[in-house]
Amino acid sequence: MMVNKKEKKLGFTTIQHIPRTKYGLSNNDYCVADAIYHLSNNPNSIVFGWCFATRETLGSFFDLSKRTIINSINTLKAKDLIEVDNQTKYLRTTQKWYNEFVLYQETIQKKYKG
């Protein structure tokens, strides 16, 4: 008997490799941080400013295990790229992520648009 699971997948992640390698992040680490950034900035979120997706849900986006997500979260936290609320375990990216990754991407886009 086949069980029909409702899968949650993200379409794509544009990886900025220069800052990724500068911070020693794997592609998985980058994808996890990028998902946290976008989920915590969703204006329709019931908890604006925080990503409240479970580790399992984050894993389902990329076909990664819960353990892999936890390892990525630990890596990102150690590099001060995300923070974890100790009480709720919600996640959000830090100003450092924004400065080093989001602004980098915006700078590149502007450079090649005009």
Where are these regions (language model features)?
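Short recognition helix of helix-turn-helix/winged-helix DNA-binding domains
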Residues: 1-64
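Winged-helix/helix-turn-helix nucleic-acid-interaction surface
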Residues: 66-114
